Amino acid sequence: EIAFRNLRQPKENTGFVANYIDAAFNNCIFMWDSAFMLMFGKYADRIFKFQKTFDNFYSHQHVDGFICRQIEEDTGNDVFARHDPASTGPEVMTWCEWEYYLNFGDKERLSRVFPCLVAYHQWMQEHFTWRDGTYFSSGYGCGMDNCPRLDEKYHVCYSHGHMVWVDACMQELNACNLLIKMAKELGREEFIPELQQE
């Protein structure tokens, strides 16, 4: 009942392309919240295509692969600048799309979203890693803004604190493994060596 009260249609001039479920928080769609709502929504797929909520993130993907984790519903604007440690993540869309594929076998959708997911992962690898290849994030960026892990001089929601974030590393490792599975399923083996190397 709560979910169906929060179904939305795209507003004009927002760049949104599909009906979606809203987190009912602050007139924004959120990558993290959407992923978990879609995990539950898949059980009502015959009534409403909850998975298409992600299409509104893909339609806002920047040319270099970046996808903001929070997008305003009224304007379609990204809430955060791309290199802000709180701008994106966690990389849960890959996991959610794979789970959807396992449930419904929708290869057309998997084929359509795979390039978006690979480009997003490549952006994360390029811009959210330290020199040794480990990942950083922020409380908002990794979805764990209530974990007291930073020194007091850093803001838990917005700062990376110059640390390696083990949860961000594990999220990216999971995404790599799932992208490899997708590549095999779709016959896109050209992506596998780079993903395996990471």
Ranges and model annotations:
Residues 6, 10, 60-68, 127, ...:
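A short secondary-structure junction motif
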Residues 35-48, 92-109, 170-188:
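Well-ordered alpha-helical scaffold segments within catalytic/enzyme domains
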Residues 26-30, 82-103:
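C-terminal capping/lid segments that line or modulate ligand- or cofactor-binding pockets
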Residues 18, 23, 69-92, 125-197:
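The feature captures the catalytic groove of carbohydrate-active enzymes
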Residues 29-33, 116, 164:
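Short, glycine/acidic-rich beta->alpha junctions
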Residues 1-4, 47-58, 94, 98-101, ...:
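Hydrophobic core segments within long, regular secondary-structure runs in both alpha-
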Residues 1-29, 48-52, 56:
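Low-complexity, Ser/Thr/Pro/Gly-enriched N-terminal "stalk/linker" regions
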